[in-house]
């Protein structure tokens, strides 16, 4: 019911600390064994998910731990039960994280778009 109203999926077994804040929550997914510390902020499209799904893993920690005072920006994906985001860290938008990062980390996704690799033979005139 609530997913239909908010677009947010938080498994009821997830552990969430005090002063947890979701801004623009559409697309947020928080798995069953996720642990979120105090004073954590997350933005739209963030996934705290598992690396794999199997019935044999039902009683195993499959989702990440986010320690206190972290910010997870839009569309960041953090996967795995052994993945820990250390306290006071920032995970930038569109980041993909499957390994732990220490406290006070800043993780960024940098897209590299190469438009052209060889120089123009003549000057290019653009008319706008």
Walk through the language-model features, giving the residues of each:
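Terminal amphipathic alpha-helical/low-complexity segments used for targeting or macromolecular assembly
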Residues: 1-6, 119-128
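Left-handed beta-helix
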Residues: 6, 11-12, 17-18, 23-32, ...
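PLP-dependent aminotransferase-like
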Residues: 53-54
């Amino acid at each position: 019911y609530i997913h239909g109203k908010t677009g947010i999926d938080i498994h009821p077994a997830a552990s969430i600390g005090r002063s947890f804040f979701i801004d623009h929550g559409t697309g947020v997914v928080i798995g069953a064994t996720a642990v979120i510390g105090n004073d954590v902020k997350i933005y739209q499209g963030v996934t705290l998910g598992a690396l794999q799904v199997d019935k044999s893993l039902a009683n195993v920690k499959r989702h990440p731990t986010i320690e206190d005072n972290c910010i997870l920006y839009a569309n960041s994906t953090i996967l795995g039960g052994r993945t820990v985001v250390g306290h006071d860290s920032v995970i930038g938008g569109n980041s993909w994280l499957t390994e732990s990062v220490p406290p006070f980390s800043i993780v960024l996704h940098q897209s590299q778009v190469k438009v052209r690799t060889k120089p123009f033979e003549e000057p290019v005139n653009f008319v706008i």
